[in-house]
């Protein structure tokens, strides 16, 4: 059985208006050099945004609401928070690095990950939950430092906006079709 991972794929808008993949998809935990990024949580992945396209009217002469429900109703965007721990060495091995060098390596790995996330749409794919979602970074982030058994690491949380206001089954092509059609 293949090892399960968390993947992210960066998309940039072309001059023609389509969203194109910027390179290959990356493993969140394996592809950001300098240190080791470890997934902690993604809060809000399964949240569903308020349904748009539903309208009600109330009249004094009626006991019931007049209701309109668009058959193509969509969800408002939702918020999610991706939290990762970034270590300054390969956590699967041993380290001979000084504390200062470990912190520098952790900062390098964090900078690499954050540069990949910002200024683009990010397709998240989660092997564990078999879910995918389309995110963008909209808020500032401030990593904090901490120690586990005298090993320094960065705790980094990134606030994301879920473009569709929901996640999709891993086999769905809804997001990819939307990206190819320029966000339509």
Where are the predicted features?
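Extracellular/virion structural assembly segments
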Residues: 2-184
């Amino acid at each position: 059985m293949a090892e399960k991972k968390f993947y992210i794929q960066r998309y940039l808008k072309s001059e023609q208006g389509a969203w194109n993949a910027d390179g290959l998809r990356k493993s969140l935990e394996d592809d950001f050099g300098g240190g080791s990024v470890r997934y902690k949580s993604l809060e809000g992945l399964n949240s569903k945004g308020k349904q748009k396209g539903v309208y009600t009217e109330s009249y004094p002469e009626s006991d019931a609401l007049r209701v309109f429900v668009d058959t193509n109703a969509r969800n408002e965007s939702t918020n999610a928070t991706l939290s990762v721990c970034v270590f300054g060495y390969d956590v699967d091995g041993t380290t001979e690095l000084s504390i200062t060098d470990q912190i520098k390596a952790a900062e390098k790995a964090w900078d690499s990950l954050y540069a990949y996330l910002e200024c683009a749409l990010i397709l998240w794919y989660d092997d564990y939950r078999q879910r995918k979602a389309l995110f963008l970074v909209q808020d500032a982030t401030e990593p904090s430092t901490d120690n586990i058994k005298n090993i320094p690491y960065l705790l980094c949380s990134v606030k994301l906006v879920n473009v569709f206001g929901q996640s999709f089954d891993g086999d769905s092509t809804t997001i990819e079709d939307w990206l190819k059609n320029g966000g339509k």
